[in-house]
Amino acid sequence: MPGRARSSEPGFREAYREWLDRVNPIIARHQYGRGGPVILYNAENEYQVNTDAAYMQDIQDRARAAGIDVPITTNDCCDAGSWSSTWATGPGAVQIPGVDDYPQSFACDTPGEWGP
């Protein structure tokens, strides 16, 4: 696929828009206010390596255009001073920024090993 992944570059934008345009109407039908279980819309996940505000804003705009009206969120890994702090306001900012972290140095590739 042409274009840098997780960006607003045209090749990738065409691909993610096609996907969102099929998935978002399904999510919209299943929102909490319409009798479904969906209470949040996670626009991205651990997006601290790229900070393309146009990409994040486009994802949110497409969600709203599809009728998604629950709060929009995203989460950053390890509170790395990334999306939630860098983009707290302005284009691409989400309503509920979140942070995730892995307890006790847990690594998915070594699930039997835990740090102190």
Go through the PLM ranges and name each one.
Residues 1-59, 63-69:
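Active-site mouth of glycoside hydrolases
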Residues 46-69, 76-115:
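Substrate-binding cleft/loops of secretory-pathway carbohydrate-active enzymes
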